[in-house]
């Protein structure tokens, strides 16, 4: 194994601890905005014609003057049928819809048309007249109404504004919201009708073999979330992981255990959230021959604040700022000392973007981390307890990115996932290092095998999905092939650390999923199995085979 530890421990606790325990955010519910249906011309409209001298459009938006003029110019000075007049009104309406003004209607008002006379069209600035929330569970009804209140009566409203408010209304933990738009009673008025279901509690339970051999390979994991119990959109959650032997959890000898709690708390109705979270993990790896057994401790407190800068069906751009305090230390069992001790504070700034493009889905994340201070080399020298990495310092800087892309795939899916990190040439604490392994990189190696200060990974997959169905729901069986390459560097390595690491893997796998309980996969479960072949320049990891298994159920 190649980690930042010179003492031979297979993996530090921070390397098997996820960066967050917060439940993933599900997709928005069905958002349906009816496109303009268009005016219906009267009977025999194609047989009635009139010579038009001029066309006036009342109530038009200045930003649509060019599009409007392009349509009306085709009518001026010509003999046109009544059907052509109605078609022109519909064309102007479609031009407004194309610019996002989907509630605008263009009318042909009652008028007496004479040969050589003018034609009058009227643009009606549509608006949301009211929101019908009777189909929303009562406890969440007031919050949904509050998040949509800014739409009511607003003129010049665009599709992007409507989508943002609807997605915010659906962003209530446990709520699955669908919406439709219908014509209201007032001229230009629109009625927004909402239907929703709400799950007050959600959770997952599963197992996998992502851990290294020194930690027993297998782990059991579970998570539980309480969704908006007070009706303010809050979420309280907890997560736990442990080694495969449950009997050892209570006598503190399990190879790995993780506990964490947190809360997602909305502030206001425009998408601002704060997320305090505490995580504690412990590893008790199998001892290296000739060395005493040791135990690693890692704890972390995070306070995150996030805000959606752009929020539509086509794009979600979110900014997040995080303050984090972390401590990690490794102690030999039976000795009153530490092998290393890291304590530091860090601020992180993150931009995360999700795009839905005609050819597929594209997501990117940029993170900049700046150390704010903590235990450094001076304290290490005074206490005779070193840091996890020689040369590391608590005011570090690092930058990372991740760009997963996935094509739209009714049957054949293609995915490309790239990740990278730079530490600007300086060593990092183990908890801040970059992983070259894992399910989204060189998956022939378990978590914690390769941790570096700077590096990059690239993984490609091709998957063929075979849907199947039954009376209660649907599922998919998806075989896939993959290939991955990773490169990394340890800045200022010790004599026992490789300065440069490369790792590649390729193989085949199978994923199964169901959206409802089945005889094979209960509770809407997911199951995956993968056979991977790996290559590396690290001694002992040159050529390996690995089978990866993961199973999870959600409720």
Where are these regions (language model features)?
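Gram-negative/organellar outer-membrane beta-barrel architecture
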Residues: 138-142, 158-360, 543-554
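Periplasmic polypeptide-binding modules associated with outer-membrane biogenesis and secretion
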Residues: 4-211, 223, 240-257, 418-419
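Transmembrane beta-barrel strands of outer-membrane/channel proteins
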Residues: 181, 205-209, 222, 236-242, ...
